[in-house]
């Protein structure tokens, strides 16, 4: 039960962070393009890599820290389900190029940012 509480606690704060960050980012533009989702997915990828790099290489953390930070917080901060839904909406709107850039761009950039964040975390 303790592990579920850790994941849920991290999830509460991660989802609140996603809601605030994506809302602020979306309000800064008049475009209907989902910039808020892009921001949280890319920032989340960078932070995931950073935390992972720190947890794996620099600081000895209990396995519970991984559950709280990576599974709970980071899992609810990033929004793959939202990415796929908004990608589908772009496709249904016949916005082929935007959909491709949205989906492929975030996926490639996310992988690169996890790698960069992990490297950065190893240096900390």
UniProtKB/Swiss-Prot annotation:
Family annotation (InterPro entries): FluC
Source taxon at top rank: Bacteria
Membrane topology designation: Multi-pass membrane protein
Pfam families, per database record: CRCB
Reaction(s) this enzyme catalyzes, per UniProt: fluoride(in) = fluoride(out)
Regulation: Na(+) is not transported, but it plays an essential structural role and its presence is essential for fluoride channel function.
Keyword Nucleotide-binding: no
A GO MF term: fluoride channel activity
Parts of the chain that traverse the membrane: 4-24, 35-55, 67-87, 100-120
An individual GO BP term: cellular detoxification of fluoride
GO CC terms of this entry: plasma membrane
Residues holding Na(+): 75, 78
Alphabetically ordered keywords of this record: Cell inner membrane, Cell membrane, Ion channel, Ion transport, Membrane, Metal-binding, Sodium, Transmembrane, Transmembrane helix, Transport
Protein location: Cell inner membrane
NCBIfam families, sorted: crcB
Similarity-based family: Belongs to the fluoride channel Fluc/FEX (TC 1.A.43) family.
Primary role: Fluoride-specific ion channel. Important for reducing fluoride concentration in the cell, thus reducing its toxicity.
Protein name according to UniProt: Fluoride-specific ion channel FluC
Organism: Nitratidesulfovibrio vulgaris (strain ATCC 29579 / DSM 644 / CCUG 34227 / NCIMB 8303 / VKM B-1760 / Hildenborough)
């Amino acid at each position: 039960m303790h592990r579920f509480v850790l994941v849920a606690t991290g999830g509460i704060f991660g989802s609140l962070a996603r809601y605030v960050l994506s809302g602020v980012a979306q309000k800064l533009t008049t475009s209907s393009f989902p910039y808020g989702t892009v921001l949280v997915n890319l920032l989340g990828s960078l932070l995931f890599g950073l935390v992972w790099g720190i947890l794996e290489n620099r600081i000895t953390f209990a396995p519970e820290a991984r559950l709280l930070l990576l599974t709970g917080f980071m899992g609810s901060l990033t929004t793959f389900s939202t990415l796929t839904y908004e990608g589908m909406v772009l496709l249904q709107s016949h916005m082929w190029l935007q959909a491709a850039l949205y989906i492929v761009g975030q996926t490639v950039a996310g992988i690169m940012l996890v790698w960069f964040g992990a490297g950065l975390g190893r240096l900390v």
